């Protein structure tokens, strides 16, 4: 069961984590030249986009937010691209391949966080912020302490994601392309730095859009071919899958993936609220011109993601029929070649031949590049905008801020490559769960309460936010994944895999208590400023739009 839960954490979109789609032993595959050629075409095309974008990046606004000129539809595709990761594509289809109906329940769980973003966050975030979520949290609170906390929360999440991403990139490429792990990690790191350094948000947005379109096309074709095989009948699809799956009719029974209600609730809360606290997702709402376009972004993103997760369900059941029952895709021991996470890739070969297999492999690699570019830009903006320009050197010019941002991109890229190599054989699945827990326990409570609770003060936000962050990290370390599986202790001090239920509670209680007991003059002034903030958040008066953003 622990392995199943680890696999669950591994499919966080988070994620956007190819690392999580590849769990267990990795068997290097023969060199796939079709995949390599198609991937090189993608790289050349996206580098051309980066060159085009670099000619249009003239200011801080252009670099961080593409000048605020991305449409709601385009931004929705880009946001969906962040979520439609290699982990989602390979991991969830593998989950359906092994567990059946439970895979659909889990994949749809990713969508639960989006109504929160749509109804509670998107409009006010766009009306109050400029470049990062810290702009919103610090709107009426003390700039220095709040920006330091927000930047730390963002950087920890970005660092955890990047490490897991780089390890996953190496493993995934070893599986799909037959290339050396270290070459793959360096290649991803270099391309990531080029996209962000020269093209900024404009380049990363269009890379995400192109990747999302390619992935939706590939997944749609696979699902179409599977349904064609069964006469476009879901009844035939499920019947044939049950007939060949080792579990038989049990693959249609839900409830076998989480061991107890506390774990289920904690995992669900982490996914739901963590989504609303991911820095690279929140940053995308500043790329549109106004709150209306921000709402449209979430609407389109939710539609694309919902469609995609339905496709992965069909792909998973198709893999049961066409891959699981075909000895051509099994090794001598009867296991799927490359592991269960290769189910969707083998299905691509089964329905479209070697050429389509190369296409799907190249798209899977492209998903990694697109997501790491977004993560890197989010981390760089936290350092250059939140820390450098608003804490350490107030009044810095745009040119100085952009220089710091680009230096940070280089540093993050080099660190990501080094750590990707060092963590090659380490268990990094816990990093995804920890990233979501921190986003849900530190970033989300402060952003939400700063926009909705008039009695919030800097003291409450600081103490509650740090308590949430520290609680998430400590409980994750004391839990079964790190304390037992990595550190080798016999029994975990904290019995649950996911800390979000407890760390989120600590954060909200801490923020409420320390704000409610803050009787300082500064606290009173911050409460009085809420009315002006509320008017701005509702009307958008004073918000910068379009080219002036």
UniProtKB/Swiss-Prot annotation:
Classification lineage: Bacteria, Pseudomonadati, Pseudomonadota, Gammaproteobacteria, Enterobacterales
Gene: actP
Keyword tags: Cell inner membrane, Cell membrane, Ion transport, Membrane, Sodium, Sodium transport, Symport, Transmembrane, Transmembrane helix, Transport
Subcellular localization(s) per the UniProt record: Cell inner membrane
Membrane topology field: Multi-pass membrane protein
CDD domains recorded: SLC5sbd_u4
Any one GO cellular component localisation term in the record: plasma membrane
Residues exposed to the Periplasmic side: 1-32, 99-102, 169-182, 235-260, 326-349, 425-427, 485-493
A GO term for molecular function: symporter activity
Residues spanning the signal sequence: none
Taxonomy, superkingdom: Bacteria
Sequence similarity: Belongs to the sodium:solute symporter (SSF) (TC 2.A.21) family.
Function (record text): Transports acetate.
Name recorded for this polypeptide: Cation/acetate symporter ActP
Key word Transport present: yes
Cytoplasmic side: 56-75, 126-145, 206-211, 284-302, 373-401, 451-461, 517-549
GO biological process, one term: sodium ion transport
């Amino acid at each position: 069961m622990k392995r199943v839960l680890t696999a669950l954490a591994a499919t966080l979109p988070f994620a956007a984590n190819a690392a999580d789609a590849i769990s267990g032993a990795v068997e290097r595959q023969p060199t796939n030249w079709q995949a390599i050629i198609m991937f090189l075409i993608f790289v050349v095309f996206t580098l051309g986009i980066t060159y085009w974008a670099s000619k249009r990046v003239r200011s801080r606004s252009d670099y961080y937010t593409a000048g605020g000129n991305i449409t709601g539809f385009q931004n929705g595709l880009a946001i969906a691209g962040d979520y439609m990761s290699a982990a989602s594509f390979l991991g969830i289809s593998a989950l359906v391949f092994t567990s059946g109906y439970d895979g659909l329940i889990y994949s749809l769980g990713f969508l639960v966080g989006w109504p929160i973003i749509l109804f509670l966050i998107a409009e006010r975030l766009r009306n109050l912020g400029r470049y990062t979520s810290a702009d919103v949290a610090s709107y009426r609170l003390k700039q220095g302490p709040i920006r330091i906390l927000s930047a730390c929360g963002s950087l920890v999440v970005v660092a955890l994601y990047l490490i897991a991403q780089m390890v996953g990139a190496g493993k995934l490429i070893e599986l799909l392309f037959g290339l050396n792990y270290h070459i793959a990690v360096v290649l991803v790191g270099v391309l990531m730095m080029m996209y962000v350094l020269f093209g900024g948000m404009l380049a990363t947005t269009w890379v995400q859009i192109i990747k999302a379109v390619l992935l939706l096309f590939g997944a749609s074709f696979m699902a179409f071919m599977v349904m064609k095989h069964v006469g476009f009948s879901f009844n035939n699809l499920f019947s044939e899958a049950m007939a060949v799956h080792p579990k038989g009719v049990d693959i249609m029974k839900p409830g076998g993936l989480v061991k107890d209600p506390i774990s289920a609730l904690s995992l669900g809360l982490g996914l739901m609220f963590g989504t609303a606290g991911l820095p690279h997702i929140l940053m995308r709402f500043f790329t549109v011109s106004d709150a209306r376009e921000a709402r449209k972004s979430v609407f389109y993103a939710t539609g694309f993601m919902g469609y995609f997760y339905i496709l992965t369900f069909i792909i998973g059941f198709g893999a049961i029929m066409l891959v699981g029952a075909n000895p051509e895709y099994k090794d001598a021991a009867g296991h799927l070649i490359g592991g269960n996470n290769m189910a969707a890739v083998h299905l691509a070969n089964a329905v479209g031949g070697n050429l389509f297999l190369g296409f799907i492999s190249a798209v899977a690699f492209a998903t990694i590049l697109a997501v790491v570019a977004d993560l890197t830009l989010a981390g760089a903006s936290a350092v250059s905008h939140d820390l450098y320009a608003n804490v350490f050197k107030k009044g810095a010019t745009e040119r100085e801020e952009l220089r710091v941002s680009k230096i940070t991109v280089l540093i993050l890229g080099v660190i990501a490559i080094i750590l990707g190599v060092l963590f090659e054989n380490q268990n990094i699945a816990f990093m995804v769960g920890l990233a979501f827990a921190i986003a849900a326990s530190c970033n989300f409570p402060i952003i939400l309460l700063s926009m909705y609770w008039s009695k919030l003060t800097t003291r409450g936000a600081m103490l509650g936010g740090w308590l949430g962050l520290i609680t998430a990290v400590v409980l994750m370390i004391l839990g079964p994944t790190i304390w037992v599986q990595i550190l080798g202790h016999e029994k975990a001090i904290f019995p649950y895999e996911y800390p979000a239920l407890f760390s989120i509670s600590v954060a909200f209680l801490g923020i409420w208590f320390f704000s409610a007991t803050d009787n300082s003059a500064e606290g009173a002034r911050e409460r009085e400023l809420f009315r002006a903030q509320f008017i701005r958040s509702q009307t958008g008066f004073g918000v910068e739009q379009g080219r002036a953003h």
